[in-house]
Amino acid sequence: MSLVTDLPAIFDQFSEARQTGFLTVMDLKERGIPLVGTYCTFMPQEIPMAAGAVVVSLCSTSDETIEEAEKDLPRNLCPLIKSSYGFGKTDKCPYFYFSDLVVGETTCDGKKKMYEYMAEFKPVHVMQLPNSVKDDASRALWKAEMLRLQKTVEERFGHEISEDALRDAIALKNRERRALANFYHLGQLNPPALSGSDILKVVYGATFRFDKEALINELDAMTARVRQQWEEGQRLDPRPRILITGCPIGGAAEKVVRAIEENGGWVVGYENCTGAKATEQCVAETGDVYDALADKYLAIGCSCVSPNDQRLKMLSQMVEEYQVDGVVDVILQACHTYAVESLAIKRHVRQQHNIPYIAIETDYSTSDVGQLSTRVAAFIEML
């Protein structure tokens, strides 16, 4: 059963946001508004926002420019890194082209070396992320890195960031997080109210919506409509409920979601950077602003952190809240931290929750679509 409303058209608008958003970016540039590009959820967006800049996620989820990237980078490197670099080098990403500053981060060794080459053709500021998040030294490092970013932004754009402006940015970003979370929490409904593909269209597409007030209002209205229609009986057929974890997913990696839903499952939740990992926790709006920002961003359960207890905690929470029947761990080829951590995730899911787990290694090509479908079909049949 499919939802017979105009909601699918709205979902498609979010899906197309990346393609159409460059017109908005051109308008922002013509109005003299600074643009800051980012690749990672660890980047504290509130800091450039407080300087009046617009933050945009840069292109990194297609194999379109990987061949060009491999002229400079190793072939056996994560496709996300090669895609990021390739889009920048070729100027095929309008968001990169119009960015006044790119903020990178040391979430993996490949990325931090890639940023050295990227800095040859674009201003790049790299934040040094601590490997651990539990000790005072790591926390002090991250607070210092946020202040260093603030100084770079202030000098780059000639705009001093006040505490009031930072608090306003925190409040606005929190409202956006809550609106997104309220939307993807619809995945907790059983039977589902909408497919995982539609959830992903909206959550991924929202990163290319730059008017945050309009985005918040649109998300709130859409969430209310979906929930109302579900309560009126417009529901999808019951199927095995799948939680996706692992590497960032969007663009070419959406083939995993399609494989799941074309073979009899529903993706009801995303624990990864595209979903709850980046959005579930807000920044405290009281107390010291830098302490509050540090608390939020150091709570991101990324595999680059050791130990990564926060990821296990969030997985447990989502398995229960989303009534999950199986977990699919998506690992991009040559992503060492997520690949190594997959054993810990498998043990946790099976031993703590007694539900099936499968790890899927993939890249941005279409060459493994058939194999993906076969493996996923067997996994779902087992459920």
UniProtKB/Swiss-Prot annotation:
The organism's place on the tree of life at top rank: Bacteria
GO biological process assignments: DNA damage response
EC assignment: 4.-.-.-
Group of enzyme by EC: lyase
Pfam families listed in its UniProt record: HGD-D
InterPro entries: FldB/FldC_alpha/beta, YjiM-like
Record-level Gene Ontology MF annotations: lyase activity
Annotated keywords: Lyase
Family: Belongs to the FldB/FldC dehydratase alpha/beta subunit family.
Name used for this protein in its record: Putative dehydratase subunit YjiM
